[in-house]
Amino acid sequence: MGTILDKIVEQKKKEVATLYETYTPIKESRKTHSLVESLQQFTVIAEVKRASPSKGDINLHVDVRKQVKTYEECGAGAVSVLTDGQFFKGSFYDLQTAREESSIPLLCKDFIIDKIQIDRAYEAGADIILLIVAALPKEKLKELYSYVLEKGLEAIVEIHDEEELEIAIELNPHVIGINNRNLKTFEVDLGQTEKLGKRLNEEKLLWISESGIHSKEDIIRVKRAGAKGVLVGEALMTSSSIRTFFEDCKVNI
């Protein structure tokens, strides 16, 4: 029996096959917005996340336009949108809706295994593509990263452990994302940010912390580790006061 990540990747292979049968990428280029510029100061990448394998339904019927508008008004430096339908109940339509509402950098959060998914994300309005080291053979990761650059987009290369960190460093990517969630077990440990952040600081690489960030104390912890930003989904999707969360992110250390 495979891990959750194995199941997701198998589903992505089916989706990619369907895309090749039903979708023709557009050729036009368009203006993009830079996450790297946003990360020159501590940044919240605020996520539109309807559901997840670990939590089930989180905010299934969220009004994407309203949520994204609130994020931008509260000071988000970028917005992340889950486009996976099977496990996270998102869609490329959600991404497109977010693009129509917002002019800040937009991340396509999905399990990317093929160039055609990047084409689809580009057409829907993404500026940033998530590439997950754990989900890709090394050569495929390099190929997809090169394609992201070719499209004029930026990438967050996501890691969870030391082995994945070494693979990511070879790419010298725009941004590295330390995922505190183990995608094989979906368990969360904020200690991964502190452990892996030390090496990324030594390499002088731009990096963010992802998953498991719910409180002011968590923000202080990842800031002290050297993160230039945080990607936050569940805490914002269930918050009764999104503005308060953003105020907490302004804490000095």
From Swiss-Prot:
One of its GO terms (molecular function) is indole-3-glycerol-phosphate synthase activity. The keyword Amino-acid biosynthesis applies. InterPro entries: Aldolase_TIM, Indole-3-glycerol_P_synth, Indole-3-glycerol_P_synth_dom, Indole-3-GlycerolPSynthase_CS, RibuloseP-bd_barrel. GO terms for biological process: L-tryptophan biosynthetic process. Pfam families: IGPS (PF00218). Gene3D superfamilies: Aldolase class I (3.20.20.70). Its EC number is 4.1.1.48. The keyword Glycosyltransferase does not apply. Keywords: Amino-acid biosynthesis, Aromatic amino acid biosynthesis, Decarboxylase, Lyase, Tryptophan biosynthesis. It catalyses: 1-(2-carboxyphenylamino)-1-deoxy-D-ribulose 5-phosphate + H(+) = (1S,2R)-1-C-(indol-3-yl)glycerol 3-phosphate + CO2 + H2O. It is an enzyme of class 4 (lyase). Pathway: Amino-acid biosynthesis; L-tryptophan biosynthesis; L-tryptophan from chorismate: step 4/5. Belongs to the TrpC family. PANTHER family: INDOLE-3-GLYCEROL-PHOSPHATE SYNTHASE (PTHR22854:SF2), TRYPTOPHAN BIOSYNTHESIS PROTEIN (PTHR22854). HAMAP family: IGPS_B (MF_00134_B). This is Indole-3-glycerol phosphate synthase. It comes from Bacillus cereus (strain ATCC 10987 / NRS 248).
